[in-house]
């Protein structure tokens, strides 16, 4: 039982933030690499500083991968890792649950 509680607590500490959830959900919805400014616009009113911090956290947790192109100008994109895709699958369940119970 302790191991299960510890796993749940660790997961919540990683993703239990409004902006982390909103960012991962945006990747789950689009299913393609996304750029910083696109996320900043879609997640308004998030500040650029908050978005930057949360993206760094998601990269640190290996949920997102940051890719830097070798083109000029340099293009930076983020995309879900396998771990991130697995996490994004939870959003489908959360969406179904939300639709079912939103009227109560």
At which residue positions do the language-model features occur?
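Amphipathic alpha-helical dimerization/coiled-coil segments
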Residues: 5, 89-104
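A short, conserved structural fragment
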Residues: 59-69
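Basic, amphipathic "hinge/linker" alpha-helix immediately C-terminal to the N-terminal HTH DNA-binding motif
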Residues: 70-91
């Amino acid at each position: 039982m302790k191991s299960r509680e510890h796993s749940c607590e660790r997961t919540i500490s990683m993703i239990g933030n409004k902006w982390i959830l909103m960012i991962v959900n945006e990747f789950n919805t689009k299913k393609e690499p996304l750029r910083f400014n696109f996320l900043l616009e879609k997640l308004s009113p998030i500040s650029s500083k908050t978005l930057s911090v949360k993206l760094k956290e998601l990269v640190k947790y290996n949920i997102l991968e940051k890719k830097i192109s070798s083109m000029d100008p340099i293009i930076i994109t983020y995309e879900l890792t396998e771990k991130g895709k697995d996490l994004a699958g939870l959003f489908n369940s959360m969406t179904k649950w939300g639709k079912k119970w939103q009227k109560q």
